[in-house]
Amino acid sequence: PDRTVRSLTITRIVTVNLQTDEIGQYLYRQELPANSNSEMVGLSATDFLVLERDGSFLYGGPNGAAGVTPDAQKQVYRIDLSTGTNLETVALLPGMVQDPDLGLTINGKTLEQVVLEGGWEALAAVGIYPVDKTLALDMVVAANYPHDKMEGLWRIDDSHLGVLNDDDFATWSTGGVLEQKMLDDATIDAGRLY
């Protein structure tokens, strides 16, 4: 595929069974195109918490008041792999091929290209579905999360979850000039555990 598929809501989750070396591959549907999924925490063999975020700052970041983003997305979803199609073991219909370089293709197109041209409905039409997900935590609502990045999840126990930000060493580059990474007009970003 080319760069046109980068701004989609489709991403993949790959699993490896360490006892059998069996590989699984599942689709995850993001809330917004080009969001990031930078962390997963296992709850069981099929249940996971997945971090999903955009790159915006709740209070404007380096752009100050002009960059305020009240709808910033910093969320954790609970997923169940057993609800999605395992792309490694899917029954191949006419036109489907397990390409050694591109993975499962449909009529010569990657799944990303299929979604680009026909939406998620085009995959559903051939029996391919993403994993189900439910919102477990919205950090903007729960903690007024001001950072652009959520990068770490820590399952403390069955009732507590730690969330870590990535402050990029509190630096930011604008036009190639290195400067302090700001959360708003007055606050320098810093690493923090929530």
Residue ranges and their predicted role:
Residues P1-Y194:
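Sequence/structural signature of beta-propeller domains
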